[in-house]
Amino acid sequence: MHVHTIDCDYMDAPGVAAAYLLVDGDEAAFVETCTSRSVPRLLAALESAGLTPEQVRYVVITHIHLDHAGGAGALMAVCPHATLLAHPKAAPHAVDPTRIVAGASEVYGADRFEELYGTITPVPAARVRALDDGDEVPFGSGVLRFVHTRGHANHHFVVVAPQADAVFTGDAFGIVYPALQDAGLFAFPSTSPTDFDPAAAHAAVDAILATGMGRAFPTHFGEQRDLTGMATQLHELLDAHAAILEQADADGLEGEALDAFCQARVRSAFDSKVQAAGLEHHPDLGLLDLDVDLNAQGVAFALAKRRYKRSKARG
C-alpha cells in the first residue's frame, strides 16, 4: 500500500494540515479531508496516482473537527462509490452538520468561517458507516483497523493500516509542524476544547504506540518515524497541562482569572519547550500562537466541566 501526503494549505499555510491518500491495487481511500476548499487538491492527488473518483472506496475522518472533516460531504459528492467511515459519535454530525457549523460560525464569525471552511455539505446517511473500537474493514490487500482514542475529542479514532506499517493519528498523537523540526523532533499535544481529558489523552498516546506500527501520520503534519520520541514529548507536555489544570482548581480560579492563568501557564510551558529546543528565534514560531491559545482554552474548559460534574454529584 502506498501513502500519499497531501498538503491542504489550510489557512493558506503550507505544512499545517494534511490529508492522506491510500492506494492499494486499484482501490483508493482518503484519510481526512480538511475543508471543502481542499477537495480540488485531494482530487488532483488522486489523478496523479492514476486513479479516478470512482475507485475511491472509503473516505475516513478521524473526528468531526472541521480541519479534518469539513470537506467530507463535498468529497463524497464526487466519489460515487465511497463510504464515509467515522466514529459513532462523529457520524451523526457528518449527516447533519448543523450544530458543528453553528458552533464554528459563532466562534469565527460568518465571514471568517466562510473564508476558512466554505460550504459544509451533509453526507447521506446511507453512505455513512460508524466504526466501533477494534472494527476492521477490507481494503486492497489487507484491512484498515479502527482504535478509539479519547483525550482530544470524544468522537476520535485512529486508523491502523498494517500493510503500510502505518497509523493515521488525527490529533490523538500530537502536532509536528515540519517548519519547526530544524533542531530535531518538536512535538506537542492538542488539548483544545471541548473534550480535553489528560488521562484519556495519555492513554491514547499509549494505545497508538501499542499498535506496533513503525510510521505515524498525524494530520498536523506528515509522516513520522520516531514514535517513541513523540510519545515521550507528548506525555511530558500533557503532564504540564494537567498540572496547570490541577493548580487552577486548587486556587479556585474561575472566569477571566481562570482564562488568564491558563493562557499564561500554557504559554510558559510552550516557551520552555521552545527554549529547550533552541527555537527561540525561529522565523516560523508564530505557528504555535493559535495552538497555545486553543490548548489554554481546552484546559480551562476541562476544569469547568470537572466542577460542573462535582456540583451535579453533590445534588
Predicted regions and their residues:
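Conserved beta-strand hairpin/beta-sheet module of binuclear metal-dependent hydrolase folds
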Residues: 1-49, 159-171, 175
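Active-site/pore-lining binding-face segments in mid-to-C-terminal subdomains
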Residues: 199, 204-265
